[in-house]
Amino acid sequence: VQQITYSVLMDKHSLQAQIDALTRLHGAAECEIGVLTRFDIPELAQLSLAAYGERPTLEAQAEATDEMRLCFEGVFGTPLEGSFLGAWVDGNLVAAIIVVVDPPVEEPSGLPQVIDLMVHPNFRRRGIATALVAECARRCQDWGASSLIVRIDEANAHLPHVYDIFQESDNCAQA
């Protein structure tokens, strides 16, 4: 029986799911998943702008690039080995998931937390985000984590689709 509860914390929605359930998710086979590096920051910044519907002005590109750089520097939480994953289709970055431990706005839990999950609008509803979550869950097992926390800002227009992914795992609690 799936247990679902819900609350809003500081304009963010929270989900927590057991790793075992998430590893059983099936996502898109059309994408290649790999670890993002600092060399991917420019493309990751462009993806962020597209995913969040922002116009790609020079100022917006500079801000998105700075934000991605700060993610890699650990400003938004401590990155784990291979915890920033991307999905590529035909050599183009079309989706990304960013996972950290102990983001500064939360009480330290030691659990991995998804702080961003973005998919280019042209590639949504194809299972790519699901594939990223499943791969992230497998990596969480390698890190010794038993669950994964997701915090998504209410402003993310695709929040319902993120919830769909986690509810598919049949072992998800919203906190």
Identify the meaning behind each predicted range:
Residues 116-119, 125-138, 142, 164-165:
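Conserved acetyl-CoA-binding loop-helix of GNAT-fold acetyltransferases
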Residues 46-62, 75:
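Helix-loop element at the rim of GNAT/NAT acetyltransferase active sites that forms part
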Residues 84-86, 92-101, 113, 118:
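Conserved beta-strand in the GNAT
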Residues 149-160, 164:
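Conserved beta-strand-loop-alpha-helix junction that forms the acyl-donor binding cleft
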Residues 60-84, 88-89, 98:
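Active-site rim helix/loop that mediates acceptor-substrate recognition in acyltransferases
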Residues 1-31, 160, 171-175:
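Acyl-donor-binding surface of acyltransferase catalytic domains
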Residues 140-152:
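Conserved GNAT acetyl-CoA-binding A-motif
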Residues 32-46, 57:
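A short beta-loop-alpha structural element at the N-terminal edge
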